[in-house]
Amino acid sequence: MSNAVKRSTDPTVFSPPRQFSFLRHAAVLKRRGVSRSKHYADIQAGLYPKPVAIGPRAVAYPDYEVDLLNAAKIAGKSEDEIRALVAKLHAARGAALSS
């Protein structure tokens, strides 16, 4: 039997991977295919998670969050569903340290 974590095909079901990498801002914009202003507008509207501080003057995004949100868009999720997903992602960030 495999030790691999079984991933859901539903983009609203969150299961963080055991390994991930951080994507810097330019890489996120490229993966999303949006402008810088649209990206920040989505963050303000709750449609995209806030970046994670990785240094005193550097921020990035966990790659799995970017992929999960892209999958939600592809699946045709509504803005309300995406806001709920973003809220789950933010909550999971805090819960990761407490487990």
Q: Where do the PLM segments sit?
A:
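Residue-level detector of alpha-helical recognition elements and their boundaries
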Residues: 43, 54, 66, 81-82
